[in-house]
């Protein structure tokens, strides 16, 4: 008889706080630190903790699998949940820097600022190597970038993907007006952050 394949429907994990934390104690973290596996180009330390605060992305860029993998609704862990992971692992592994690998770390300013309040107390440098959407919160972008910098963010990656508006509009469906890129770069630099695009 022919084989039958059943593909179950995808389900999103709605409450990220219910997910177990990464079991870093089971991994040879010293080996990763030694080879610089978690570093961005301008890392302040080779002892980097990679963290994800959220899942999902409302954008529909043709090259990206995030909406298919995590869904289009952005779901955040609570600051308390993030704090528990970071506090424990910073101490356990003598961490010198935190890198947030979220696809849309800046989409929700309330959650971002709550995270910044906590990170300011931690006192470690941090960055966003995966990229942040350039045109979120344009009217309050200066305030947002300054808050990030004040809490220890030394480098922001702006996800431009292309310097050609036709490519952005017609090939990769990246909803981005290139006219917003240079002002965003200037705002981030004025806040004291390095900028990667």
Positions of PLM-derived features:
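Radical SAM [4Fe-4S] cluster-binding motif and immediate context
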Residues: 24-196
């Amino acid at each position: 008889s022919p084989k039958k394949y059943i593909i179950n429907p995808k389900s999103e994990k709605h409450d990220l706080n219910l997910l177990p934390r990464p079991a870093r104690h089971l991994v040879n973290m010293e080996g990763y630190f030694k080879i610089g596996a978690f570093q961005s180009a301008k890392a302040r330390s080779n002892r980097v903790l990679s963290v994800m605060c959220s899942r999902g992305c409302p954008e529909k860029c043709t090259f990206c699998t995030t909406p298919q993998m995590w869904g289009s609704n952005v779901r955040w862990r609570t600051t308390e949940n993030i704090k528990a992971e970071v506090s424990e692992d910073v101490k356990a592994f003598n961490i010198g820097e935190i890198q947030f690998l979220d696809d849309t770390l800046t989409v929700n300013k309330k959650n971002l600022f709550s995270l910044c309040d906590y990170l300011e107390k931690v006192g470690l440098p941090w960055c966003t190597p995966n990229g942040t959407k350039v045109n979120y919160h344009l009217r309050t972008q200066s305030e947002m970038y300054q808050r990030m910098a004040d809490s220890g963010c030394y480098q922001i990656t702006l996800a431009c993907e292309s310097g050609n508006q036709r490519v952005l509009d017609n090939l990769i469906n990246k909803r981005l007006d290139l006219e917003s890129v240079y002002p965003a770069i200037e705002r981030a630099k004025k806040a004291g952050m390095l900028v990667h695009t």
